C-alpha cells in the first residue's frame, strides 16, 4: 500500500477494534467480516463504483451516502459504520481501497475468534490447511484455476472443509481463494501469520522428522524469541524424510539443521 492508504488502514484498524469492542465482539465481528467480503465482491465487478467511493473530488458525506444507497440494506449497523469510515478516508488508488476492506474483514473475523477464545485455533487450522493443500497439488491447482468461477472454487473448498474447521477459518479460507493473488497454500499461510501477529507473535515454520512435544515447542519458542526479539508461534510440520534435526523458517530466513541437510552437504563436499 502507498503512504496515504497505509495511514488510512492504521486508523481504520483502530476504528474496527473500537466498534467490535463496544458490542458483542464474537457476534459482530463474525458478521462484519463476511459482509465486508460481500462488499468487495460487488466492488470487484464494478470499477465505476470503486472509483466513485474514493473520489477525492466528492465530499466524504457524498461518498458515504453512495455507500449507504448501494450497500445499506445489505449490511448490519456495525458493518455500515465501518464501511462509512472507510470511504471517509484517503486512498491512493482503488486497489488499496479494495484490499483495505479485505484486511478489515479479516481483522473483524480474527477479533471474533479472539473474543471466543479461538484465535490460536484459527491460526493453527489455517496453517494445517496450507499443509493439506501443499500435499494435494491437484486440489490446489483446481482452487487456483482462474477459468473456474469463484463460486465453483469456493464450493470445492467448502466441501473439503465441511465439519473439519471452525466457521471463521472456513470463511477466511473461502474468501482468500475466491480472488487470490497468491497460491492457495501461500494465501492460507498469510492468513495464519496475520492471526499470529494479531496476538503479538511472529511465526516460525518448523519441520521435524517426528512430532514435537509441548515441552520441546515451548523451549524452541523461547530460544527463537531470544534470537529474533519477538514472541514466537511455532507452526510445526512433520516430514520423516529429513531423518532428524529440524528445518526452521522465519520470514525469508531458512535454517537447515536437518540430518538430511547435513548429509547432503557432506555429499557435495566429497563430490
UniProtKB/Swiss-Prot annotation:
Signal peptide boundaries: none
Membrane topology type: Peripheral membrane protein
Compartments, record wording: Cell membrane
Annotated InterPro entries: ATP_synth_OSCP/delta_N_sf, ATPase_OSCP/d_CS, ATPase_OSCP/dsu
Top-level taxonomic group: Bacteria
Broad class of the protein's primary localization: membrane
GO MF terms, alphabetically ordered: proton-transporting ATP synthase activity, rotational mechanism
Pfam families: OSCP
One GO cellular component term noted in the UniProt record for this chain: proton-transporting ATP synthase complex
Keywords, ordered alphabetically: ATP synthesis, Cell membrane, CF(1), Hydrogen ion transport, Ion transport, Membrane, Transport
Keyword match Translocase: no
Subunit (UniProt): F-type ATPases have 2 components, F(1) - the catalytic core - and F(0) - the membrane proton channel. F(1) has five subunits: alpha(3), beta(3), gamma(1), delta(1), epsilon(1). F(0) has three main subunits: a(1), b(2) and c(10-14). The alpha and beta chains form an alternating ring which encloses part of the gamma chain. F(1) is attached to F(0) by a central stalk formed by the gamma and epsilon chains, while a peripheral stalk is formed by the delta and b chains.
NCBIfam families: ATP_synt_delta (TIGR01145), PRK13430.1 (NF009967)
Family as reported in the entry's similarity comment: Belongs to the ATPase delta chain family.
General function of this protein: F(1)F(0) ATP synthase produces ATP from ADP in the presence of a proton or sodium gradient. F-type ATPases consist of two structural domains, F(1) containing the extramembraneous catalytic core and F(0) containing the membrane proton channel, linked together by a central stalk and a peripheral stalk. During catalysis, ATP synthesis in the catalytic domain of F(1) is coupled via a rotary mechanism of the central stalk subunits to proton translocation. This protein is part of the stalk that links CF(0) to CF(1). It either transmits conformational changes from CF(0) to CF(1) or is implicated in proton conduction.
UniProt-recorded name of the protein: ATP synthase subunit delta
Native organism: Corynebacterium kroppenstedtii (strain DSM 44385 / JCM 11950 / CIP 105744 / CCUG 35717)
Gene name, Swiss-Prot/TrEMBL: atpH
Amino acid at each position: 500500500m502507498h503512504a496515504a492508504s497505509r495511514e488510512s488502514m492504521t486508523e481504520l484498524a483502530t476504528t474496527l477494534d473500537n466498534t467490535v469492542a463496544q458490542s458483542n465482539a464474537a457476534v459482530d465481528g463474525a458478521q462484519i467480516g463476511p459482509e465486508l467480503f460481500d462488499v468487495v465482491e460487488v466492488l470487484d465487478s464494478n470499477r465505476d463504483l470503486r472509483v466513485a467511493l474514493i473520489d477525492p473530488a466528492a465530499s466524504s458525506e457524498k461518498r458515504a451516502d453512495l455507500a449507504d444507497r448501494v450497500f445499506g440494506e445489505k449490511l448490519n449497523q456495525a458493518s455500515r459504520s465501518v464501511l462509512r469510515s472507510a470511504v471517509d478516508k484517503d486512498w491512493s488508488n482503488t486497489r488499496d481501497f479494495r484490499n483495505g476492506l479485505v484486511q478489515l474483514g479479516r481483522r473483524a473475523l480474527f477479533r471474533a475468534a479472539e473474543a471466543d477464545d479461538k484465535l490460536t485455533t484459527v491460526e493453527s487450522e489455517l496453517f494445517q490447511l496450507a499443509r493439506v493443500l501443499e500435499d494435494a497439488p491437484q486440489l490446489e491447482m483446481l482452487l487456483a484455476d482462474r477459468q473456474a468461477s469463484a463460486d465453483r472454487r469456493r464450493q470445492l473448498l467448502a466441501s473439503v472443509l465441511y465439519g473439519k474447521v471452525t466457521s471463521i477459518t472456513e470463511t477466511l479460507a473461502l474468501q482468500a481463494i475466491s480472488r487470490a493473488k497468491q497460491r492457495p497454500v501461500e494465501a492460507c499461510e498469510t492468513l495464519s501469520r496475520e492471526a499470529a501477529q494479531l496476538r503479538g507473535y511472529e511465526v516460525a515454520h518448523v519441520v521435524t522428522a517426528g512430532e514435537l512435544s509441548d515441552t520441546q515447542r515451548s523451549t524452541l519458542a523461547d530460544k527463537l524469541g531470544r534470537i529474533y526479539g519477538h514472541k514466537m508461534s511455532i507452526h510445526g510440520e512433520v516430514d520423516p524424510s529429513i531423518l532428524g534435526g529440524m528445518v526452521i523458517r522465519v520470514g525469508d530466513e531458512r535454517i537447515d539443521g536437518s540430518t538430511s541437510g547435513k548429509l547432503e552437504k557432506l555429499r557435495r563436499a566429497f563430490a
